[in-house]
Swiss-Prot record:
GO molecular function term, any single one: growth factor activity
GO BP annotation list: cartilage development; mesenchymal cell differentiation; mesenchyme development; negative regulation of glomerular mesangial cell proliferation; negative regulation of mitotic nuclear division; ossification; positive regulation of brown fat cell differentiation; positive regulation of DNA-templated transcription
Function noted in UniProt: Growth factor of the TGF-beta superfamily that plays important role in various biological processes, including embryogenesis, hematopoiesis, neurogenesis and skeletal morphogenesis. Initiates the canonical BMP signaling cascade by associating with type I receptor ACVR1 and type II receptor ACVR2A. Once all three components are bound together in a complex at the cell surface, ACVR2A phosphorylates and activates ACVR1. In turn, ACVR1 propagates signal by phosphorylating SMAD1/5/8 that travel to the nucleus and act as activators and repressors of transcription of target genes.
Protein name per the record: Bone morphogenetic protein 7
Keywords of this entry: Chondrogenesis, Cytokine, Developmental protein, Differentiation, Disulfide bond, Glycoprotein, Growth factor, Osteogenesis, Secreted
PANTHER family: BONE MORPHOGENETIC PROTEIN 7, TGF-BETA FAMILY
Length: 187
């Protein structure tokens, strides 16, 4: 569920880093061998580049989505999901060296395996009453319905902007469309 996805990801990340560094914390005062147990099956959580960032970092933080329910859609054929994160827990003076928006994409059984979709992540720049928000495209990916696993989007610049200007933190929007532009509900 929503409230345990970030902690489970952090546990998996810890286990991935511990295994990579030589088997975990057994050499750190534990008298028993450490066996990593991962909560998700799938591709590695940390890429080689992520591992370099993590090795140099003195802190890793995870944030859960604060949006409980998506707003009613103004345009009945435009579907999206909203995500908001409270970055006020980042200690003052700390530099954010990397920030990622990670979502897990399930296998879409209701579609043909080779059907392709475009997944786009937008920064919400301004919200309006009675019409769509102003958005800035951060990244998009084209995926098959049969693909499954973590999707990682780099939002370092956006999160740094939000840390410096918290009132501009209006969140992210995720949109899914077919390649011919038909909006799909990203449930």
């Amino acid at each position: 569920g929503k409230h345990n996805s970030a902690p489970m990801f952090m546990l998996d990340l810890y286990n991935a880093m511990a295994v990579e560094e030589g088997g975990g914390p057994a050499g750190q005062g534990f008298s028993y061998p450490y066996k990593a147990v991962f909560s998700t099956q799938g591709p590695p959580l940390a890429s080689l580049q992520d591992s370099h960032f993590l090795t140099d970092a003195d802190m890793v933080m995870s944030f859960v989505n604060l949006v409980e329910h998506d707003k009613e859609f103004f345009h009945p054929r435009y579907h999206h999901r909203e995500f908001r994160f409270d970055l006020s827990k980042i200690p003052e003076g700390e530099a954010v060296t990397a920030a990622e928006f990670r979502i897990y994409k399930d296998y879409i059984r209701e579609r043909f395996d080779n059907e392709t979709f475009r997944i786009s992540v937008y920064q919400v720049l301004q919200e309006h009453l009675g019409r769509e928000s102003d958005l800035f495209l951060l990244d998009s990916r084209t995926l098959w319905a049969s693909e499954e696993g973590w999707l990682v989007f780099d939002i370092t610049a956006t999160s740094n902007h939000w840390v410096v200007n918290p009132r501009h933190n209006l969140g992210l929007q995720l949109c899914v469309e077919t390649l011919d532009g038909q909006s799909i509900n990203p449930k």
